[in-house]
């Protein structure tokens, strides 16, 4: 895929990308009290589930590893590209101009 094709795809799916980001931002995923099936608490388990749900909707095969982490993959073959990230947050605190759990767009 050429760079221009990638840029066009991003431009064409901007609203979908922002909608999916909004779904994730809305979840308070700060570290919580571990519970059955939720090793990092309820919030991180919820955001992991939501992220994997979004990946499913986008056509990826997803795997949840006991709510410790998960991954999404597409295609077959021996060569892979891996991108690591995290979905948990630090406590939101009270010094926000906007609601920290609501995606805000300016401009």
What are these regions (language model features)?
Residues 1-8, 75-83:
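Short charge-dense sequence patches
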């Amino acid at each position: 895929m050429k760079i221009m094709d990638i840029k066009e795809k991003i431009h064409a799916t901007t609203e979908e990308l922002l909608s999916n980001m909004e779904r994730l931002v809305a979840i308070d995923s700060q570290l919580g009290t571990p519970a059955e099936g939720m090793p990092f608490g309820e919030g991180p388990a919820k955001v992991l589930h939501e992220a994997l749900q979004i990946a499913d909707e986008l056509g990826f095969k997803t795997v949840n590893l006991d709510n410790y982490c998960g991954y999404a993959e597409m295609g077959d073959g021996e060569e892979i590209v891996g991108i690591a990230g995290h979905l948990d947050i630090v406590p939101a605190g009270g010094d926000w101009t906007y609601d920290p759990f609501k995606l805000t767009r300016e401009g």
